[in-house]
């Protein structure tokens, strides 16, 4: 099997607050896929970083009365810790506020400027005369000029997806002061996105993005691409534009370059990795971006055009997912439907949410509802009752009478062969990111394994001393089948997989599926994963609501 070299990224969390469980969907989705790729023997570098620039960060740090550099450093540490505790296997978690990103950004800007893709012109902008600052798109809200939906930001409508400028908003208001902004002129720099229309059409039609996402992008082509404003006026927290007085790069110019900067930093740590092998225009490696559907425009149009114009490679694929709702409602701090990652981790096992998201995730950009009642039922039924019960019910006898030694013979090889033959289909589902179908297939096998034990009832056979060897072979088969199931679940449940490797006294590898454990001793099974009780969920939601009230009062 040919080993592939891959670079996989997640969209960069914004460094102005804590991660919530909705944010974790993307990190979990990408991590499952990365872990599966590594099990197949592929060389994968998995990276992420905090998106650490912009007006929002500048204002938040002022509100907290600390330097923005201090604030983003603290938040990065928190984000990194949350991802680590959720088992997200990043090779590097960095920040866009870095020397590597700044140097690469300047290089890209210079290349684009030299090749004639940077234009300048005076533009009219909304200006908050109370705060003495130009208002970025995300600090203006008003009525969408197309669908007339109220409370929409100044760059695109969350309701209908229309892209527009803040000047097109109906009845705009400053998010900062609540006042109606005035219009002022300023000279800005623009990236000539329309010049890449044909290049982008070819790239998108090559299968680099999902079909439904490509259809959405085609709508933007029909409307005609517009030059992209890549500059912002002071005051601003970010990288200054070279040879430009009091002008800064717009956060969406340096944020995707943060992928490159983060990888460059990884190359400094590991001298065996070549930056150009992964980002050079003639790269033979694969580059994958996992993103949410709200940032399609930036990643599927602006970013590949910037890469093409600056003579770097374009992504192999961009995988788009939907949003997370909680009990059918949008995740919202003000409405008390926001559960921070740290709060979740104080109450529940991270593998449980990883599994639940896996049962919902597909290759499409559909929204996913985290229904907490269904969450309890699914975790208790599948992980506890089906998977862990299989290990628990079969290991006791083996230790009691045979000191943990498994039978050396497969009494019923047909069921074992059926289990390992499923690796081809389950592997294809993992590869295609159809995790929901993969979990369904794995749980079907778990049901078969438990039915096998129920059918042969080794506890009855074991009552007769002369038939204990026969009982051992049945119990041993239960352990063999548990091992196969845990190999399939290893990308999804890293914490449980680590425990299972200790219990089984062997590594869980895809390549070892065909060979059952022979002449092998297992360790005693210990209950470290327990059922979810409704009071744990109640405690988690209560803690979340209390945290939001305290945060609102203190900041």
Swiss-Prot record:
Q: How is the cofactor bound?
A: Binds 1 zinc ion per subunit.
Q: What reaction does this enzyme carry out catalytically?
A: tRNA(Met) + L-methionine + ATP = L-methionyl-tRNA(Met) + AMP + diphosphate
Q: What Gene Ontology molecular function terms does this protein carry?
A: ATP binding; metal ion binding; methionine-tRNA ligase activity
**Which InterPro entries does the entry link to?**
aa-tRNA-synth_I_CS, Anticodon_Met, Met-tRNA_ligase_1, Met-tRNA_synth, Methionyl/Leucyl_tRNA_Synth, MetRS_core, MetRS_Zn, Rossmann-like_a/b/a_fold
> Which positions does the motif 'KMSKS' region occupy?
330-334
User: What EC number(s) is this enzyme filed under?
Assistant: 6.1.1.10
Q: What does the entry give for GO biological process?
A: methionyl-tRNA aminoacylation
Q: Which residues bind ATP?
A: 333
GO cellular component annotations of the record:
cytosol
Q: Does the keyword Cell cycle apply?
A: no
CDD domains to which the protein is assigned, alphabetical: Anticodon_Ia_Met, MetRS_core
Give a single Pfam family match: tRNA-synt_1g
* UniProt-listed SUPFAM superfamilies: Anticodon-binding domain of a subclass of class I aminoacyl-tRNA synthetases, Methionyl-tRNA synthetase (MetRS), Zn-domain, Nucleotidylyl transferase
Record localization = Cytoplasm
Q: Which UniProt keywords apply?
A: Aminoacyl-tRNA synthetase, ATP-binding, Cytoplasm, Ligase, Metal-binding, Nucleotide-binding, Protein biosynthesis, Zinc
Motif annotated as 'HIGH' region, chain positions? 13-23
Q: Which family does it belong to?
A: Belongs to the class-I aminoacyl-tRNA synthetase family. MetG type 1 subfamily.
Quaternary structure, from the entry: Monomer.
State the protein's name.
Methionine--tRNA ligase
What's the gene?
metG
């Amino acid at each position: 099997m040919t080993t592939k070299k891959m670079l996989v990224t997640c969209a960069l969390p914004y460094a102005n607050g804590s991660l919530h469980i909705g944010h974790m969907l993307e990190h979990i989705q990408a991590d499952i896929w990365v872990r599966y790729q590594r099990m197949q023997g592929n060389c994968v570098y998995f990276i992420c970083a905090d998106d650490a620039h912009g007006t929002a960060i500048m204002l938040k740090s002022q509100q907290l009365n600390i330097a923005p550099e201090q604030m983003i450093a603290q938040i990065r540490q928190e984000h990194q810790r949350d991802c680590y505790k959720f088992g997200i296997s990043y090779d590097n978690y960095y920040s866009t506020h870095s020397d590597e990103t700044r140097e690469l950004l300047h290089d890209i800007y210079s290349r684009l400027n030299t090749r004639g893709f940077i234009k300048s012109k005076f533009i009219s902008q909304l200006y908050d005369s109370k705060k003495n600052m130009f208002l970025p798109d995300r600090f203006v809200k008003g009525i969408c000029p197309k669908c007339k939906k109220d409370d929409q930001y100044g760059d695109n409508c969350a309701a209908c997806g229309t892209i527009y400028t803040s000047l097109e908003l109906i009845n705009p208001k400053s998010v900062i002061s609540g006042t109606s902004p005035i219009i002022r002129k300023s000279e800005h720099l623009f990236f000539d996105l329309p010049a890449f229309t044909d290049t982008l059409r070819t790239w998108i039609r090559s299968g680099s993005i999902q079909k439904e996402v490509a259809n959405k992008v085609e709508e933007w082509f029909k409307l005609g691409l517009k030059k992209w404003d890549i500059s912002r006026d002071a005051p601003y927290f970010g990288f200054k534009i070279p040879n430009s007085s009091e002008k800064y790069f717009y956060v969406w110019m340096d944020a995707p370059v943060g992928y490159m900067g983060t990888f460059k930093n990884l190359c400094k740590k590991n001298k065996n990795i070549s930056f150009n092998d992964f980002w050079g225009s003639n790269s033979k490696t694969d580059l994958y971006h996992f993103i949410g559907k709200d940032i399609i425009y930036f990643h599927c149009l602006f970013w590949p055009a910037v890469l093409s114009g600056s003579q770097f490679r374009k992504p192999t694929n961009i995988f788009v997912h939907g949003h997370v709702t909680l009990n059918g409602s949008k995740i919202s701090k003000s409405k008390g439907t926001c559960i921070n990652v740290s709060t979740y981790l104080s109450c529940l096992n991270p593998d449980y949410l990883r599994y639940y998201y896996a049962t919902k995730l597909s290759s499409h950009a559909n929204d996913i509802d985290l229904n907490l009642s269904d969450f309890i039922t699914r975790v208790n039924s599948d992980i506890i009752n089906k998977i862990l019960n299989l290990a628990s019910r079969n290991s006791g006898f083996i230790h009691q009478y045979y000191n943990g030694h498994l039978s050396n013979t497969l009494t019923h090889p047909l069921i074992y062969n059926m289990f390992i033959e499923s690796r081809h289909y389950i592997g294809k589902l993992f590869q295609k990111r159809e995790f929901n179908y993969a979990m369904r297939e794995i749980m079907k096998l778990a049901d078969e394994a438990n039915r096998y034990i129920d059918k042969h009832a080794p506890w009855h056979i074991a009552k007769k001393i002369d038939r204990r060897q026969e009982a051992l072979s049945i119990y041993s088969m239960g352990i063999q089948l548990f091992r196969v199931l845990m190999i399939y679940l290893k990308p999804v449940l890293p914490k449980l997989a680590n425990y299972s490797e200790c219990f089984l006294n062997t590594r869980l590898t895809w390549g070892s599926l065909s060979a059952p454990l022979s002449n092998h001793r297992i360790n005693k099974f210990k209950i470290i994963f327990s059922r979810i009780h409704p009071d744990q969920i109640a405690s988690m939601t209560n803690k979340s609501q209390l945290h939001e009230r305290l945060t609102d009062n203190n900041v």
